[in-house]
Amino acid sequence: MSITAERTQELVKEYATKEGDTGSAEVQVAILSERIRNLTEHLKSHKKDFHSRRGLLIMVGQRRRMLDYLKAKDNKRYEGLIGRLGLRK
């Protein structure tokens, strides 16, 4: 259900803006998106797991706020990120 440390490192390498970057908005959104995908798969088979559903909604809101921040600060980075992650449009 949770993502492994190896998968997290792969995401950090893929979405980092520079060497050693683990906290940029792009990396955080990518990790959140992976966790959201995993939790969505879990909820497809465990429909009554409402505690996990609440966690999912919290993560989606957190990702939304992070994307809003990125859009306000640098629209080009925002557009590139949602394109790479396959989020909306």
UniProtKB/Swiss-Prot annotation:
The keyword Membrane does not apply. One of its GO terms (molecular function) is structural constituent of ribosome. Gene3D superfamilies: 6.10.250.3130, S15/NS1, RNA-binding (1.10.287.10). It comes from the Bacteria. CDD domains: Ribosomal_S15p_S13e (cd00353). GO terms for cellular component: cytosolic small ribosomal subunit. Keywords: Ribonucleoprotein, Ribosomal protein, RNA-binding, rRNA-binding. Pfam families: Ribosomal_S15 (PF00312). One of its GO terms (biological process) is translation. One of the primary rRNA binding proteins, it binds directly to 16S rRNA where it helps nucleate assembly of the platform of the 30S subunit by binding and bridging several RNA helices of the 16S rRNA. Forms an intersubunit bridge (bridge B4) with the 23S rRNA of the 50S subunit in the ribosome. Part of the 30S ribosomal subunit. Forms a bridge to the 50S subunit in the 70S ribosome, contacting the 23S rRNA. Belongs to the universal ribosomal protein uS15 family. This is Small ribosomal subunit protein uS15. It comes from Paramagnetospirillum magneticum (strain ATCC 700264 / AMB-1). The lineage of its organism: Bacteria, Pseudomonadati, Pseudomonadota, Alphaproteobacteria, Rhodospirillales. The gene is rpsO.
